[in-house]
């Protein structure tokens, strides 16, 4: 999605407000951009709903925003979708869906996806325990 000059300024200001923990202001700035289909703004909205930052915690809304962002190939949202499916947060718990999304994150080089999937295999969390696969993923992540 191409942003005009004002929208770029709103995005940057919204991200800065989020970083500075001015969650209500971040919501005001990022929400219109998310509604217009901006993937990063959608991801940030998901995180805000997921954690109750500036808005009441709402796992269903978080999953909706995360999926919209992930479907636009926003890489951090791939990890977010994996986490949501792993935990059953806003979606039905589904280890195979979690693996699918974490694998996309791994392909993009996301260390968080590597380590989280490694822990799933190490602990047998929704999957059959596989210490060798866990070790391979941890090495890939630099551990």
Predicted regions and their residues:
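Hydrophobic face of amphipathic alpha-helices that form TPR/SEL1-like repeat modules
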Residues: 10-11, 16-17, 44-51, 55, ...
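Alpha-helical segment of the N-proximal tetratricopeptide repeat
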Residues: 6-36
């Amino acid at each position: 999605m191409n942003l005009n000059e004002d929208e770029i300024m709103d995005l940057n200001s919204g991200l800065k407000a989020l970083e500075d923990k001015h969650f209500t202001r971040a919501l005001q700035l990022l929400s219109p951009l998310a509604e217009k289909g901006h993937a990063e703004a959608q991801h940030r909205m998901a995180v805000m709903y997921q954690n109750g930052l500036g808005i009441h915690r709402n796992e269903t809304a978080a999953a909706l925003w995360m999926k919209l962002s992930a479907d636009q190939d926003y890489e951090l949202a791939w990890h977010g979708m994996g986490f949501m499916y792993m935990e059953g947060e806003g979606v039905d718990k589904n280890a195979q869906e979690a693996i699918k999304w974490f694998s996309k994150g791994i392909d993009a080089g996301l260390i968080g996806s590597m380590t989280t999937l490694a822990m799933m295999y190490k602990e047998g969390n929704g999957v059959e325990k596989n210490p060798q696969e866990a070790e391979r993923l941890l090495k890939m992540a630099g551990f």
